């Protein structure tokens, strides 16, 4: 993420034979998971650079940790997967569209850093956890029968993996405090430059 006049991007593409994780395999009834904490990179972007909060979250923005080894293990059984680069709401919707499915997400279940509520105003929380990208955590779906395996992988890598919802046959819905919730953010749009 840059506000400067120049941006350089490098892309490497490769395929692990017979273990391809795509966006298009989610099935109705599969659980939705995320790795790590969501919203930290966006928090760094919106907080004043002179604050303790910015200093605390800065590493999440400038040095995200790719979940490569964890992703390789997930490729054994996950039905779909995407990295959270454009915001959880947008990236999860990409899985749903590619899979021709819907989803239900419990916003209360989306994990944030333990100090998130200390440094980020409540009014900015949605923008960070649903609309903010650059976390590069994984959002994936898996059959319920893999719940124990997912817990074991979480322990093995010492990376939190949290169930945040379920794939539905149609529609996109969110709940917050056990009530229907309509997010006001949609994620990063590369063509708008937001």
Language-model features: locations:
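A short, charged helix-loop
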Residues: 44, 49-65, 115-117
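Internal active-site segments that recognize and position negatively charged phosphoryl groups
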Residues: 30-36, 64-88
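A short alpha-helix capping/helix-coil boundary motif
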Residues: 49-50, 70-73, 128-130
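Glycine-/charge-enriched secondary-structure boundary and capping motifs
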Residues: 1-8, 13, 18, 76, ...
